[in-house]
Amino acid sequence: MYTDLKDKVVVITGGSTGLGRAMAVRFGQEEAKVVINYYNNEEEALDAKKEVEEAGGQAIIVQGDVTKEEDVVNLVQTAIKEFGTLDVMINNAGVENPVPSHELSLDNWNKVIDTNLTGAFLGSREAIKYFVENDIKGNVINMSSVHEMIPWPLFVHYAASKGGMKQMTETLALEYAPKGIRVNNIGPGAMNTPINAEKFADPVQRADVESMIPMGYIGKPEEVAAVAAFLASSQASYVTGITLFADGGMTKYPSFQTGRG
């Protein structure tokens, strides 16, 4: 646990499910004030809010589409209005849908790029704007993927969004380091999240993925949440412009480098 995270105001996009929910609960355990953004499932968001509060934190929920500029502006401003400030912005909302590249529609391409990359840019921009205007040494954490560095069949749009995020994060980190604002990525590998539930329910597919992970198992959302808490804490005060991979060593596995699909 990180005592300096108590009462910090943390905004998490896509915070009602999967990795976002795990991070929300972890910051609740740290007694932070958590702003849970959700897209359309209010019941799920309310459940996440309750879980954060039961863990020891405070929480509010804010509906919004991260691809819409006005929604992201509202999200950040609501956090500031409700809790008085902003300390940590976690751009976690993301989508993926494997499609053969020659069959990928422009609408599908745009949906993934707009959600994963543009959404993260908007969240980063609004948070950094507030940090700069108020002389706050704030923290931005973007949820990337092992695919920011590893190509993968059927994921051209997703890999492009994460590769773009890598350069965006590094550029922002360099630009705002003199102001004490830190910007980092987390790069999860294969995770036990709702988006992967159907795939990993198949023993054959699960075993195939596990065979590419040196540590031998599919990651838990709580393991990514632990990385987020570290990066948000003062223990990571000299860390900026990196991607911290939580992948069980997957990016180092030789066959993974070939883009097995």
Swiss-Prot record:
Residue stretches in coiled coil: none
Pfam family, one: adh_short_C2
Record carries keyword NAD: yes
Entry keyword Oxidoreductase: yes
PROSITE patterns noted in UniProt: ADH_SHORT
Matching PANTHER family: 3-OXOACYL-(ACYL-CARRIER-PROTEIN) REDUCTASE, 3-OXOACYL-[ACYL-CARRIER-PROTEIN] REDUCTASE FABG
Chain positions recorded as NAD(+) binding sites: 11-35
Record-level GO BP terms: lipid metabolic process; monocarboxylic acid metabolic process
Keyword vocabulary terms for this entry: NAD, Oxidoreductase
EC top class, as a word: oxidoreductase
Active site (UniProt): Y158
Domain of life: Bacteria
More about this protein: Prefers NAD to NADP; very unstable compared to the other isoenzymes and 2M NaCl enhances its pH and thermostability.
Subunit structure, as described in the record: Homotetramer.
UniProt GO MF annotations: glucose 1-dehydrogenase (NAD+) activity; glucose 1-dehydrogenase (NADP+) activity
Protein name: Glucose 1-dehydrogenase 3
Reactions performed catalytically: D-glucose + NAD(+) = D-glucono-1,5-lactone + NADH + H(+); D-glucose + NADP(+) = D-glucono-1,5-lactone + NADPH + H(+)
EC number: 1.1.1.47
Family the entry assigns: Belongs to the short-chain dehydrogenases/reductases (SDR) family.
Binding positions for substrate per the UniProt entry: S145
